[in-house]
Curated annotation (Swiss-Prot):
Single GO MF descriptor: translation release factor activity, codon specific
Stretches that traverse the bilayer: none
Superkingdom of source: Bacteria
Compartment(s) of residence: Cytoplasm
InterPro entries listed in its UniProt record: PCRF, Pep_chain_release_fac_I, Pep_chain_release_fac_I_sf, Prokaryotic/Mito_RF, RF-1
Taxonomic source organism: Psychrobacter sp. (strain PRwf-1)
Pfam assignment, any one: PCRF
Alphabetic keyword roster: Cytoplasm, Methylation, Protein biosynthesis
Modification sites for N5-methylglutamine: Q238
Gene3D superfamilies: 3.30.160.20, 3.30.70.1660, 6.10.140.1950
Matches recorded under NCBIfam families: prfA (TIGR00019), PRK00591.1 (NF001859)
PROSITE patterns: RF_PROK_I (PS00745)
A Gene Ontology cellular-component term: cytoplasm
Name the record gives this protein: Peptide chain release factor 1
Length: 364
């Protein structure tokens, strides 16, 4: 292990002890925000420091076994000590790899809720139907994770599915799990309306954006935001409102638009549309930085650009292929039912490998 990493881990142990003491301080306990922030930091540090302590103990065990094997004359004793050395070496290697991953830079947005947008692209009715299939897939996955999905806006297709559906997903680590879903999703299958049995290709675009706290963003000039109201039909065309409760917000300098029509209250719709507008403006800024400076995300996991084709769902072959990491899974039925864990884990591992490669090299 690099000396620089050992030094950082020792510093984290010191910080863990400091945070532990602070959590018992009456001033901290009386400050809810400070107590919550320190509790989160304590939780993250406890996992790393515990693993670091096990790593150091394994090093001690290996060293002790090596000294015993050097002094031993009995062949059976030497064999037993060698087995301990081999076991400790395997443990050390595995723990070092885990520590390297845990020490990678964290995306501060990983734990926040996210806005999930799905839009039908090329393919007409079939694209809209597939948008509905994708939304159902994410709904099933969200349910398996204990998350909540709230539909903010929906424009249904004429033959099912959605021309566009926008939702808010809340729960633990939502953005961190879904952030690599942004891009173009292509489907190859025989539409129900196809009498000749020919396979058609259509596509949908997915965008995943972190929900940004309004207090954490640059202030928007109210004069730069235009609000339009209109009557909402709600999801599925039901509960038609007789008042203009739906809200569309436009940020004039950037042209970014957000709308919400699911609440009966115009005030609630405006608040949710404002959250979405801020998230979109923030995402546009991030994308601009990616386009100009950050080559890392564009390597394997991708830029998150909606126009970038990231995945193909081939129904005749029962396969899903993610083109960014050359991963093909022959379990399409399960995937469409929300079984995304294997896929999302693979994307995160690839991203971690990218990060490790980008910061590798340094001192030994």
């Amino acid at each position: 292990m690099k000396d620089s990493l050992r030094e950082r881990l020792d510093q984290m142990v010191d910080r863990f002890e400091e945070v532990t003491a602070l959590l018992s301080d009456p001033d901290t306990i009386s400050d809810n925000n400070k107590f919550r922030e320190l509790s989160m930091e304590h939780s993250e540090l406890s996992e790393i420091t515990a693993l670091w302590q096990r790593y150091r103990q394994a090093e001690i065990d290996k060293k002790d076994a090596q000294e015993m094997i050097n002094d031993a004359s009995d062949p059976d004793m030497k064999e037993m000590m060698q087995e301990e050395i081999d076991s400790a070496s395997r443990d050390i290697e595995a723990m070092e790899e885990e520590l390297n991953v845990m020490m990678l830079p964290k995306d501060p947005n990983d734990k926040v809720p996210a806005f999930l947008e799905i839009r039908a692209g090329t393919g007409g009715d079939e694209a809209a139907i597939f948008s509905g299939d994708l939304f159902r897939m994410y709904e099933r996955y969200a349910s398996s994770q204990g998350w909540t999905i709230e539909v903010l806006s929906a424009n249904e297709g004429e033959h099912g599915g959605y021309k566009e559906i926008i939702s808010r997903v809340s729960g633990n680590d939502v953005y961190g799990r879904l952030k690599f879903e942004s891009g173009a999703h292509r489907v190859q299958r025989v539409p129900e309306t196809e009498s000749q049995g020919r396979v058609h290709t259509s596509a949908c675009t997915v965008a995943v954006m972190p929900e940004v706290e309004i207090d954490d963003t640059v202030e928007l000039n109210p004069a730069d935001i235009r609000m339009d109201t209109f009557r909402s039909s709600g999801a599925g065309g039901q509960h038609v409102n007789t008042t203009d409760s739906a809200v569309r917000l436009t940020h004039i300098p950037t042209g970014v638009v957000a709308e919400c029509q699911q609440e009966r209250s115009q005030h609630k719709n405006r608040a949710k549309a404002m959250q979405m507008l801020i998230a979109r403006i923030q995402q546009a800024k991030v994308q601009e930085q990616v386009d100009t400076a950050d080559a890392l995300r564009r390597n394997l996991v991708g830029s998150g650009d909606r126009s970038e084709r990231i995945r193909t769902y081939n129904f005749p072959q029962g396969r899903m292929t993610d083109h960014r990491i050359n991963l093909t899974l022959y379990k399409l039925d399960a995937i469409m039912e929300g079984d995304l864990t294997e896929l999302l884990d693979a994307l995160n591992r690839e991203h971690q490998a990218d990060l490790m490669a980008s910061i590798g090299g340094g001192d030994d």
